[in-house]
């Protein structure tokens, strides 16, 4: 085995439907959640911007992760749910291709969560400018489907 980085050769693999779903959670202050629900965030509609950012990020995965293949995505769906202690993001990605789309789903979820943090950081800081309560957690692939060859 080489210590050199190299992209996996997928040229001999069949093109089939690939789907992946990932999710993650951002813990927020109750006041921030209330502001999001009431659309009182200075930067705009948090849910809309986070969904848009996640979709854009999924399409850029191969530019961010050097050994990922450039996959022609057919659908990216971002579902964002406000919960008691924060926001859950779930991303589902589909493509007909030779390799899976789980990294695209993870990137979509991660960037959606980071976008939420960016948009609400003003409200999450404590008196010292720190974020003792805010936390992104539990990012994982929750489903992966590969159509039979």
UniProtKB/Swiss-Prot annotation:
One of its GO terms (biological process) is Mo-molybdopterin cofactor biosynthetic process. The keyword Lyase applies. GO terms for molecular function: cyclic pyranopterin monophosphate synthase activity. The keyword Glycoprotein does not apply. It catalyses: (8S)-3',8-cyclo-7,8-dihydroguanosine 5'-triphosphate = cyclic pyranopterin phosphate + diphosphate. CDD domains: MoaC_A. Keywords: Lyase, Molybdenum cofactor biosynthesis. It holds the Pfam family MoaC. Its EC number is 4.6.1.17. Disulfide bonds: none annotated. Pathway: Cofactor biosynthesis; molybdopterin biosynthesis. The active site is at 118. Catalyzes the conversion of (8S)-3',8-cyclo-7,8-dihydroguanosine 5'-triphosphate to cyclic pyranopterin monophosphate (cPMP). Belongs to the MoaC family. Homohexamer; trimer of dimers. This is Probable cyclic pyranopterin monophosphate synthase.
